[in-house]
Each structure stands twice: as C-alpha cells, then as structure tokens.
Amino acid sequence: LSKNLKLSLALITAALVVLVVALLAAGNDSGSEQAGPDDSAGTGVLVREDSPRLSEGGDAVFVEFLDFECEACIALYPTIEDLREQYGDRVTFVVRHMPLHDNSMAAALAAEAAAEQGQFEAMYRKLFDTPEQWGHQQTPQMDTFFGYAEELGLDMDRFERAYNDPATLSRIEQSKQDGQRLGVTGTPTFFLDGERLDPTSVTDLENSINAALE
C-alpha cells in the first residue's frame, strides 16, 4: 500500500472509532416514535424461547434491543459483529426487536419471516448492510425486503406466509412490550446476564463481557 493510502485507511478507522465512542456516550436512539414505559400488568421477560439467537451455548448472555432502522444501531453493528467474533463461542448473543421508525416493523417482520427458514442471521446482516436502500423512507419498503428474501434464496411462498402471519407480528410486539416493561426507551439497549449495561465506549462493553466470563 502507498503511504497516502495507508494514511487514508488509518484516518477512516480512527473516524469510525470516534463515531462509535460518541454514539455510546450520547446514549441510544428513541426513534420517531419513542417507546414509553409499559404500565400494564406483568414484568418484562428479557429472553424468550423464540427470541432470535445469533449464537448459542455461551457462558454469558448478551441481549440487544434493536431497531434495524436506528442510526445508532446501524453505526454500532460492526462493533457488535466484532464482539461476536471475539466472544461468540463463549457468549450467547440474543436479538430483541424494538421497532420505533417508519419501516423498522416491516424490517423486523422480514427478519422473523426469514427465521422461519433458518435464515434470521442472513436477513439480519442484509438489513444492517443496506440501510441506504430502505431506511428513513416515508413509503413502505416491503418490496425491498421481499427482494432481499429472493436474493437469499428463500422459499418465497413460505416467506410471504410468515411475513403476513399475525403470529409473526405478535412476536415482535411482545418483544417491544418486554422491552418497555424492562425500561427500554430507545435503541440500542444492552443487557448482559440480566443486568442492563450503560457503556460509554467499546472498552466498557468488552470489560463487562470479560468480567461476566471470569
């Protein structure tokens, strides 16, 4: 690599680190529709049997309440992927849905519909890798999500049935309700072994996970 290219890559990396730190320090995104506390009877369940898992069998459980359209979630996605690579065999990473933006419910439906065919993670990655194609649009982006399902080679009849199944919507709404009852008001919000995390840096996240694994 040339010196100029090396310098450019170093500057880009540094800028990304600064952005992630700033997002963690600033707190999460409450979205266009803020999730207020749920005062209905009952308490929130942090992880349900049908909660999507990106890894299993770990000694610690890391839970993220996320919104696929949330700018902070999108910016922190590479960091979460790095944590998964670093700790994936020792930590169970769980996704909980907290849709707050215009197309985030439809995105969550696409992810859950893909999960019916064992492809949650593939759709999860696709959604986070392509926010510029569908995010922050005033019009529904269902056609885009169905296009992603085709690209992933899913059975489209099964995908459509799952996407439109009231039970799929119910799972997502249950996840959001759980989050509200647990005090989640924005995304991303993290929990580790049942305790809420309020990190201000990536190092804080790593230190918390390391402590949980000791």
Range-by-range predicted roles:
Residues L1-G27, E150-E214:
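C-terminal cap of thioredoxin/glutaredoxin-like
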Residues L1-L100, E173-K176, A211-E214:
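Extracytoplasmic thiol/disulfide redox context detector
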Residues G58, L76-T79, A106-A110, Q119-M123, ...:
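Stable alpha-helical elements in mature extracytoplasmic
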Residues F68-E71, M98-N103, D129-W134, D165-T168, ...:
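Solvent-exposed loop/turn segments at secondary-structure junctions
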Residues Q86-A149:
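Structural microenvironment flanking redox-active thiols in thiol-disulfide oxidoreductases
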Residues E69, R84-Y87, A115-G118, L127, ...:
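Sec/Tat-exported extracytoplasmic proteins
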Residues D59-V61, G88-T92, G118-A122, L154-M156, ...:
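Loop/turn elements at helix/coil->beta-strand transitions in domains of secreted/extracellular proteins
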